[in-house]
From Swiss-Prot:
Cys-21 and Cys-116 form reversible intermolecular disulfide bonds in the presence of reactive electrophilic species (RES). Formation of disulfide bonds leads to dimerization of NemR, which alters DNA binding affinity and NemR activity. Induction: Autoregulated. Up-regulated by hypochlorous acid (HOCl), the active component of household bleach. This is HTH-type transcriptional repressor NemR. Keywords: Disulfide bond, DNA-binding, Repressor, Stress response, Transcription, Transcription regulation. It comes from Escherichia coli (strain K12). Involved in response to both electrophiles and reactive chlorine species (RCS). Represses the transcription of the nemRA-gloA operon by binding to the NemR box. May sense electrophiles, primarily quinones and glyoxals, as redox signals and regulate the redox state by modulating the expression of nemA and gloA. Also uses the oxidation status of HOCl-sensitive cysteine residues to respond to bleach and related RCS. Involved in response to methylglyoxal. The redox state of the cysteines plays a crucial role in the regulation of NemR activity. Inactivated by reversible oxidation of cysteine residues in the presence of inducers such as quinones, glyoxals and reactive chlorine species. Also irreversibly inactivated by alkylation in the presence of N-ethylmaleimide (NEM) and other Cys modification reagents. Inactivation by inducers decreases DNA-binding affinity and leads to the derepression of the nemRA-gloA operon. The record marks 106 as: Plays a central role in response to RCS. The lineage of its organism: Bacteria, Pseudomonadati, Pseudomonadota, Gammaproteobacteria, Enterobacterales. Signal peptide: none annotated.
């Protein structure tokens, strides 16, 4: 087994677990498979996590922290104005689906229906992560409106909730139908929701 510092071993377990969950789901990922894939002894797992559920919570918190960081960078310093950056967020997922025929890297899409009825702690971690995404979108909408690069009806937070729910639903439908059309249709609707202001 490779030698890891204490932090590295925990991080390695979480990263390995995330990849396995993206492939098999949370219940489909056995601890034996996780430990074998990560090349970590069983005792080490329980040194860092009191249970598989606690591992799941930590995995989701890690996932959303990284997701929020990437989204923050895109919305704050990506190319173009705030409208361009919000649309780029959605376009990236559509491009990925068109290139690979699947949506990878999103634990919300993969695990939401599976774990929300199984674990209140994991549901709470997922809800907190989703609310973080919505808050970032809300701030970008508010900034875009103040900079006169986009317009929309209602309050930023309310509209961000709609945009997130629309895109999450499109992701799920694309996964079910194995078609990019739900994402394409949703993106077209997003463009109408956050319109370019009339000159």
């Amino acid at each position: 087994m490779n030698k890891h510092t204490e932090h590295d071993t925990r991080e390695h377990l979480l990263a390995t677990g995330e990849q396995l969950c993206l492939q098999r789901g949370f219940t489909g990922m056995g601890l034996s498979e996780l430990l074998k894939t990560a090349e970590v002894p069983k005792g080490s797992f329980y040194h860092y996590f009191r249970s598989k559920e606690a591992f799941g919570v930590a995995m989701l918190e890690r996932h959303y922290a990284a997701y929020h960081q990437r989204l923050t960078e895109l919305l704050q310093s990506g190319e173009g104005n705030y409208r361009d950056r919000i649309l780029a967020y959605y376009q990236q997922t559509l491009n990925q689906f068109c290139q690979h025929g699947t949506i990878s890297g999103c634990l919300t899409v993969k695990l939401s229906a599976e774990v929300c009825d199984l674990s209140e702690d994991m549901r709470s971690a997922m809800d907190k992560g989703a609310r973080g995404v919505i808050a970032l979108l809300s701030q970008a909408l508010e900034n875009g409106r103040e900079n006169h690069c986009l317009t929309f009806c209602g309050e930023p937070l309310q509209q961000a909730q709609v945009l997130y729910a629309l895109w999450l639903g499109a992701n799920l439908q694309a996964k079910i139908s194995r078609s990019f059309e739900p994402l394409e249709n949703a993106l077209a609707h997003v463009k109408n929701i956050i319109a370019t202001p009339a000159v």
